[in-house]
Amino acid sequence: MAIIGAGVVGSAIARELAQYRLRCLLIDAGADVGAGTSKANTAILHSGFDAKPGTLESRLVRRGHALLSAYGPAAGIPIEPIGALLVAWDEEQLAALPGIAENAARNGYLAAQSIDVDELYRSEPHLGAGARGALRIPDESLICPFTAPLAFATQAVVNGVALQLDSRVDGVQAHPDGLHVLVTSRDTVRARYVVNAAGLYADAIDRLFGHAGFTVTPRRGELIVFDKLARPLVNHILLPVPTKLTKGVLVSPTVFGNLVLGPTAEDIADKTATASTGAGLASLYEKGRRLVPALLEEEVTAVYVGLRAATEHGDYQIAFHPAQRYACIGGIRSTGLTGSMAIAEHVLDGLRDAGLVLERKAEFRSVRMPNIGESDARPYQCAESIAADPDYGRIVCHCERVTRGEILAAVRAPVPARSLDGLRRRTRALLGRCQGFYCAGEVTRLLSEARGQSVDTLLGLPDRTS
């Protein structure tokens, strides 16, 4: 069994399959797990209230919300159930709120509640002037987008799934014995079953198998991360009334204690265009000025860009081809993080129907990821951790309070940090106010020593020692 794509969906599928007596390979073109679309989103665990009723996405997002809400705390994935307010800014939007609540009810979500303008401003005193009312969605939550795919991949690996990175799938050949031969940028892989969870490139992989049911058009979303001093400005996830194109620009806290503004929504052709744009950031500032005016007086910590795998269809594109022993998971947009575990369940059922024999293992090992969220104690705050290993009391990244012990643990993990980017997602090092200006030298030295690499090699530079 080969799973192409080690994003949050592919990793969730690998974790699901790891419960059975199968030989599985999780393969990705990138240098790390969750390094594509999965790392750059709004980091919200969606309740599914606004999905289109009757769609596969609606069903899997609702199921995924329940699964991930239960799995997350046990696996160490930071989740904060702070709720959301869907804010109406004019009479037309206000009139749309009852219909949105009815839509939520058709999706099985019955907790949506209309609130008047007075209650809205009591809940959010820093909200910009002119709001007319809101819909309260209590089950929208914050989640760490980095830890979720890492937890899935880690649990898959400790239960026997092989992980192969830096392996772009360039071709598919049929072998006389009925196996698929995946030609990658590193080697060839033989697999009886193949699951395509390649995200932005799912359509390209699908065409290698002879199908053309959808085309992925990258939808660029730019976001601005504000300093932690801005966090008290907002108490809920502040959502706009959605459009047909996008859920719109929101203001939301993060599990790291920042505030984020975004995303934009721009369909583009280039699947690698993750640079921010002046026009995009200007648009966000204009919208942010109306949403929470005081936010624009706060310092910006970072800007990032994510590409969502939009297609011409209004639903997930999940298809099973039993004769080929092939499954395609495409068109998984901004709800993919929430739906990931339910998508994995759905794929398992489809593979079983396609003839895959599943025998459950006697043991399925659990994992607990190191906490990088602010709602629970961090290692530098834990006397027991420091007593057991003094490195957990030695802070290296002072903006984010990341310790030497966390960095070394990330390098030694079952799915280890292999780069500074990978270390950021596992520990928060270099993600703070100074963006590594003060700590990058020490963090890089620690990572290079722990990996047994020169700094030049780690950074992809010519090795000056040779």
Regions found by a protein language model. Give the residues of each.
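Flavin-dependent oxidoreductases
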Residues: 12, 172-262, 266-276, 286, ...
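Glycine-rich FAD pyrophosphate-binding loop
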Residues: 18-40
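Dinucleotide-binding Rossmann-like beta1-alpha1 core, especially the glycine-rich loop
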Residues: 43-123, 248-249
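Short beta-strand to alpha-helix junction loop
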Residues: 53-62, 87-96, 135-154, 164, ...
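Helical element adjacent to the flavin cofactor pocket in flavoenzyme catalytic cores
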Residues: 135-193
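C-terminal catalytic lobe of FAD-dependent flavoproteins
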Residues: 151, 246, 255-256, 267-395, ...
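Iron-sulfur (Fe-S) cluster-binding segments and ferredoxin-like electron-carrier domains
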Residues: 272, 403-413, 437-455
